[in-house]
Amino acid sequence: MLVTRRFRQSAMEENMKILKIDLSKHEINEEEFNQKDYGFFGGRGLIARFLTDYCDPTCDPLGPDNPLIFATGYFSGTILTTSNRLSIGAKSPLTGGIKESNSGGNVARWMTDQGIKLIMFTGQSEDWVYLYIDPDGKPALLDASQYVGMTTYPIGTALREQYGDKIAVAAIGIAGEHLGLVSSVMCSEFNTGIPCRGAARGGLGAVMGSKHLKAVVIDKAAAPYKVPMTPEQAAEFKELNKKIVAAVTGNPLTGQTMPLYGSAAGVDTTGKMGALPYKNFSGEFTPDWERIGTTQWRKNLIDHGGKSTIPCQPGCIVRCSNEYCDQHGNYLSAGIEYETVALCGSNLGIFDTDAICTLDRLCDDYGMDTIDIGTALGVMMDQGVMEFGDAEAAINTVRTMFDADSKWGPILKNGCAAVADALGVPKQEIQRVPVSKRQAFAAYDPRVIRGYGLSWERGPMGADHTAGSAATYIPNLTPEQQADYTLAVTATCDCFMCLFAWSAVNYNPEARPAICRMAGILAGMPEGPDMSMIDQNGRAILQLEYAFNEKAGITHDQDMFYGGRKNYMYQVPAAATKAPFRSIQDGPLPTPPKPPVPPTPPKKEEEKK
């Protein structure tokens, strides 16, 4: 029997609420959420805190004891740009450790407008259900049997037909139903409703599928919750926000490049420096990167009738999302990111943007991580299963994954590490697998950008594609300190705002103190805090995550890539650096020799003599 509980109206109340949903009993309970109990934690920080409190780290990640958590950011519901991101977390069935994955879209803002800070699902439903929250904030678990077997595009359409266009949806596709270890939770994009914003990493779609939870549907609030501020606080917050807007719009990347090209603009940078993955992270320079670089990407996007400069979430001034049509003008996919262009493109020797976006659409529709699927296909090509550059074979392999007679589908749904295992790579002397802690690399060669590699080795979530915000060398830090600083910056970012906007703010001398003070206003502090307190927020999150992992059996002794010393990153030099990756286990980089001191030029008087 499905249960509906009635709750108080949350709009205009000072404290938000937590929904605790027991799927085994079909019970929904509400608790008050007081931000003062959680410091500056939002999003990822709340995930770490609640998993620490409610999850046994040794539990089966696909069992009833693994909570699935939806949490909003610290600034969600305010005027701060890009602050309406959604964090989803659980123990990862892919890595076996703690996992937070975040997404744009409208789900987090709709949660906030309903006065909901966090939703925690526990247990497992016997029957397929979905959560619906109506305009008055009343939640209900409803029968989802009619949606089982649907991919994310059709279920989004069906739900909008039932509830109207103003809903926010987070749903799994058939990859999540099949408990694929790289399955994603796909969220609706702001304005368009397209399910192209994915909390894609770590297999959280499988956790959702294991609970027989097909979707979370949130209607637009009839009386939206207002973040409590006095008139004086609101005026100060608004004035400080002008500095944030100036930093983001004045930054060449977030203010000019990304609105036109999206994050795919990264291809130009990594292509030129030799960090763009090519043929399964071979380490070679990518010879044809311009074919998927910003100029050609933009030309194809516009010539085919696509769109750019789209905000993926309410209040975003970066507007880096896009819609791509094929060469015949038919809608193909949306929200195409740098990681997808690189890993489903140059990494496979594919330089056809239509083919790349077809792979993106298939992954979004099935509900899968394009990073892990792209790297898995790269390993398959490297091992001779198909040829590099064979776009048709790659597309067909993904398209038929869930057919009953698919050879590779049951393996590919579990990601790059599973494919490598099946191909016998662990028996090879050099193991060409771009994976850390069972999670695939993001689209940066760590031999060229070592900061990313250090973060991926040491990070609690493995090769997290949002780690590496401080990707360059920082003097006087050990590799462990470099990695931890980078990860702490990332953890704070995942609590506050989008990574791109955060990067513009974090390195701006006027915006940094402004966002600190904005955090203080929400905390009710008469002044401050300073940036050291904000950085400590990120470190506190890391401590919780590392502690969880240690109890789950994941320790720093395992801080190496797939195969340990046999991984090709440690063996094969990159063309750009002429050196392999130096592991965090190897200690700091050698101190470069000091250049010789040039002789002191003679004085003019001595020259005359």
Predicted regions and their residues:
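Extended C-terminal regions of large enzymes
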Residues: F7, A11, R160-A170, I174-K609
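Protein-protein interaction/assembly regions in multi-subunit complexes
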Residues: A11-G205, S210-A222, P231-N251, G262-T286, ...
